[in-house]
Amino acid sequence: MFIVGIDIAKHTHQASVMNTDGSLVGKSIKIPNTSVGFDSFISKLKEIDRDISHFEFGMEVTGHYWLNIYTHLADLGCIVHVINPVQSDSLRGLYIRQTKNDIKDSAIIADVIRIGRYCETSVSDDKMLALRDLTRQRFYLVDMVSDLKRKSLTLIDRIFPE
């Protein structure tokens, strides 16, 4: 069994593979945030073990950037753990040299999953996520219309004071 910690970023994610003993396997892997990048990532993992079911994945909830790789891995039937960044930050505090970079972050995420000391973040299905996004967009548009009405009335009152 291998644990893969993925540090999420806007353009390029960083992944570290760890065995159950806590030792890193190979070098960290850069993953472009594209479907081609995800396929290349899976190919690199298959060089370690041909059976993708021997890998468990962990990632932090970071904006919306984690959704694409999460969906890709879930569609492959992989076990994907989504954690709150606060949980990995607490483990980071145990290390003597507390420098922060993507490679170390991905290894820490893998270690959090390996140790099992995390609370899983629930992930809604695609329809619920789409509905959430539409609802947020509607609230944004309603606020914008209200703001434009207020600004228009202010201008009318200034131009035509009577």
Regions found by a protein language model. Give the residues of each.
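Gly/Thr-rich phosphate-binding beta-strand-loop-beta motif of the actin/hexokinase/Hsp70
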Residues: 1-19, 109, 141
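Acidic active-site catalytic centers that drive phospho-/nucleotidyl reactions
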Residues: 7, 60, 102-105
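Short glycine-rich, Thr/Ser-proximal phosphate-binding strand/loop in the N-terminal lobe
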Residues: 9-36
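Short, basic/hydrophobic alpha-helical segments
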Residues: 37-54
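Short glycine-rich phosphate-binding loop at a beta-alpha junction
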Residues: 53-62
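Short, well-ordered alpha-helical microsegments
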Residues: 65-69
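Anion (oxyanion) recognition and catalysis
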Residues: 74
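Long, charge-rich intrinsically disordered scaffolds of nucleic-acid metabolism proteins
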Residues: 81-162
